[in-house]
């Protein structure tokens, strides 16, 4: 058994660590509330742009737009993988990276070459360590993403898609060029509840379109991620100026930016929830370890006291025997 001093030193060390994990748990809890508020604040705009685009598509003479049309022979697919900038969030990053690897395998099986784009330092480190080629990376805002951050990534990805495979566009870092793609996908973590976060794959482009007798709706929109219904309510007819075809071309890139922004907000809430769960588990484990070490320290102290008493009694008996013999 370890000495009492060693046990007390370990107890002190574990208590210090417990203070850190408890503080991280409280911070993550407060950030979840903030992230959920931002998701709710972004929802009205997401709903309205979806409705307006559905009306535009219904009023348009044709749906002939690159962001809506399937490519005849897709060869390259850009995949945006959303990870965190910081660690201590349990399996948050490993789960989304695993989902991304499964998507890469699926794309390769379909004859498409995946081009990896990363949001978050953890994903960047993961692929860099393994020597994987990256189309681009954006870091520093995983916990507090802004619309400008989403728009920055979206602009490059939309340009990449509009160019198509076989054409070149400037690289996001401004150094050289990169070949265009025929599909856009995003892999992120959807916030379900404080205890459940689910890695998800969404195709950003070409956008899926559902055509009915009365109207045209965008399929698998960003409202299907748990923050609203994908069933659009009927809205009053619009008079569009300029022509619906021109407006459709102008708004579709903004729609993709909104979908990416919605995914980033979801991922931020999921990251904080995963970190809260991980830090709570670490704090609970620290409490259990402190209790175990305290019991061991008490047992060691009791054994030490018992030994000291035995030595004193033994010494007293020896002195008494010596005095009696005299």
Curated annotation (Swiss-Prot):
<comment type="subunit">
    <text>F-type ATPases have 2 components, CF(1) - the catalytic core - and CF(0) - the membrane proton channel. CF(1) has five subunits: alpha(3), beta(3), gamma(1), delta(1), epsilon(1). CF(0) has three main subunits: a, b and c.</text>
</comment>
<keyword id="KW-0406">Ion transport</keyword>
<dbReference type="GO" id="GO:0045259">
    <property type="term" value="C:proton-transporting ATP synthase complex"/>
</dbReference>
<dbReference type="GO" id="GO:0046933">
    <property type="term" value="F:proton-transporting ATP synthase activity, rotational mechanism"/>
</dbReference>
<dbReference type="Pfam" id="PF00231">
    <property type="entry name" value="ATP-synt"/>
</dbReference>
<keyword id="KW-0813">Transport</keyword>
<dbReference type="GO" id="GO:0042777">
    <property type="term" value="P:proton motive force-driven plasma membrane ATP synthesis"/>
</dbReference>
<protein>
    <recommendedName>
        <fullName>ATP synthase gamma chain</fullName>
    </recommendedName>
</protein>
<dbReference type="InterPro" id="IPR023632">
    <property type="entry name" value="ATP_synth_F1_gsu_CS"/>
</dbReference>
<keyword id="KW-0139">CF(1)</keyword>
<dbReference type="GO" id="GO:0005886">
    <property type="term" value="C:plasma membrane"/>
</dbReference>
<comment type="function">
    <text>Produces ATP from ADP in the presence of a proton gradient across the membrane. The gamma chain is believed to be important in regulating ATPase activity and the flow of protons through the CF(0) complex.</text>
</comment>
<keyword id="KW-0375">Hydrogen ion transport</keyword>
<dbReference type="GO" id="GO:0005524">
    <property type="term" value="F:ATP binding"/>
</dbReference>
<keyword id="KW-0472">Membrane</keyword>
<comment type="similarity">
    <text>Belongs to the ATPase gamma chain family.</text>
</comment>
<dbReference type="InterPro" id="IPR000131">
    <property type="entry name" value="ATP_synth_F1_gsu"/>
</dbReference>
<dbReference type="InterPro" id="IPR035968">
    <property type="entry name" value="ATP_synth_F1_ATPase_gsu"/>
</dbReference>
<keyword id="KW-0066">ATP synthesis</keyword>
<keyword id="KW-1003">Cell membrane</keyword>
């Amino acid at each position: 058994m370890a000495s009492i001093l060693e046990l007390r030193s370990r107890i002190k060390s574990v208590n210090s660590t417990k203070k850190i994990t408890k503080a991280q748990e409280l911070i993550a809890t407060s950030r979840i509330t903030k992230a959920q508020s931002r998701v709710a604040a972004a929802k009205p705009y997401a709903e309205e742009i979806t409705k307006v685009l559905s009306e535009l598509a219904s009023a348009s003479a044709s749906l002939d737009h690159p962001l809506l049309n399937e490519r005849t022979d897709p060869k390259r697919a850009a995949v945006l993988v959303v990870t965190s900038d910081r660690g201590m969030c349990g399996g948050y990053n490993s789960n989304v990276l695993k989902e991304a690897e499964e998507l890469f395998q699926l794309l390769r099986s379909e004859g498409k070459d995946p081009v990896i784009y990363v949001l978050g330092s953890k994903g960047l480190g993961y692929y860099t360590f393994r020597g994987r080629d990256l189309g681009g990376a954006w870091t520093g805002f995983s916990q507090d993403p802004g619309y400008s951050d989403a728009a920055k990534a979206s602009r490059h990805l939309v340009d990449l898609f509009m160019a198509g495979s076989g054409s070149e566009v400037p690289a996001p870092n401004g150094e050289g060029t990169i070949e265009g793609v025929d599909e856009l996908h995003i892999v992120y973590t959807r916030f379900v509840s404080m205890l459940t976060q689910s890695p998800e794959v969404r195709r950003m482009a070409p956008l899926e379109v559902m055509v009915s007798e009365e109207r045209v709706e965008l399929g698998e929109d960003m409202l299907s991620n748990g923050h609203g219904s994908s069933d659009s309510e009927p809205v009053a007819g619009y008079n569009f100026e300029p022509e619906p075809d021109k407006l459709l071309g102008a708004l579709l890139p903004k729609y993709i930016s909104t979908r990416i922004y919605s995914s980033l907000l979801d991922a931020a809430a999921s990251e904080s929830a995963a970190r809260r769960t991980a830090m709570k588990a670490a704090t609970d484990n620290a409490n259990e370890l402190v209790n175990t070490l305290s019991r061991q320290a008490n047992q060691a102290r009791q054994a030490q006291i018992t030994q000291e008493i035995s030595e004193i009694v033994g010494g007293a008996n020896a002195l008494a025997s010596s005095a009696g013999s005299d």
